[in-house]
Amino acid sequence: MVDGAPRAQGEAVKITYVGHATLLLEMAGVRILTDPNFEPKLGRFLARVAAPGVAIDALPALDALLLTHAHADHLSFKSLDRLPRNIPLYAPPAVAQWLVRKGYRHATPIDDGEHVTIGQALRVHTGRATHKGNRYGFDRWRSATNMYLLESNEESAFFAGDTALTPSTHHLVERVLWAQQRQLDIALLPIGYAPAWKPGFRRGHLTGDDALALFKTLRARAMLPYHWGTFRHVTASAHDAIDRLRASLVLHDAREHVHVIEPGESLTLGPEARR
């Protein structure tokens, strides 16, 4: 981990796509890493097709880790083992309790409706996603999945984790930002693809078109898709989801506000993006 790297200050929001659901978020002088996964494959057969956009040893000093749920593509024990244990690790209560029992004593539960302040000015609010996040078939008590809204007095970012599109998916943004008559700066949304013979996919995930619909509902200034281009899938390639999203964007009226970045690339939104 690299100390002394400059931090995003002022009203800038910087997002670096590490891969899959691992994003490095820098805002309000704070650095947060989401769902860290730096493994070369998922399970035995689903190989990683792109190296992490930032090597785990090259990460800057972090202020917090955010875990959304216990699925293996979002909760990587091998990755957690390589990160310092003095970084606060926030997760759904049942997941955090499990992590503590496994020796990750820096894990802290954060539940739907709760929030924590990181640094001097960044507030992280939690909402419940529509996604069964238990790791195994027998641990349904561990199925809760978090989504997170990060906001200071100047900027905001919504990290959806894994979720389906439902009439209430926007509830966290509504409760925190809309109640203050504020607009969301950027929606960080997962995209996926499953063939027609797998209809259950959309009960817990967003397709690219679902993500565009949610982006419209959230009334955010910008959108960044993730959850693509990292691991092979059983029913699709690693790039099917982003290829379909790009096709949908060709004639979409929001295409100039959707930012597709490759692993290792960063997007910075300054104050001018909020005018």
For each feature predicted by the language model, list its residue ranges.
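Pre-active-site segment of Zn-dependent metallo-hydrolases
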Residues: V2, P6, A28-A70, F77-R82, ...
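Divalent metal-coordination and catalytic microenvironments
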Residues: L25, D35, H69, S76, ...
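Metallo-beta-lactamase
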Residues: V2-G10, P92-E155, R244-A273
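Conserved beta-strand hairpin/beta-sheet module of binuclear metal-dependent hydrolase folds
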Residues: A8-V54, A64, W141-G161
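Cap/insert and terminal regions of metallo-dependent hydrolase folds
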Residues: A94-Q97, A164-P263
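Catalytic core of the metallo-beta-lactamase
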Residues: V18-M27, T117-Q183, L206, D210
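Structural motif
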Residues: V30-I32, D63-A64, P88, L122, ...
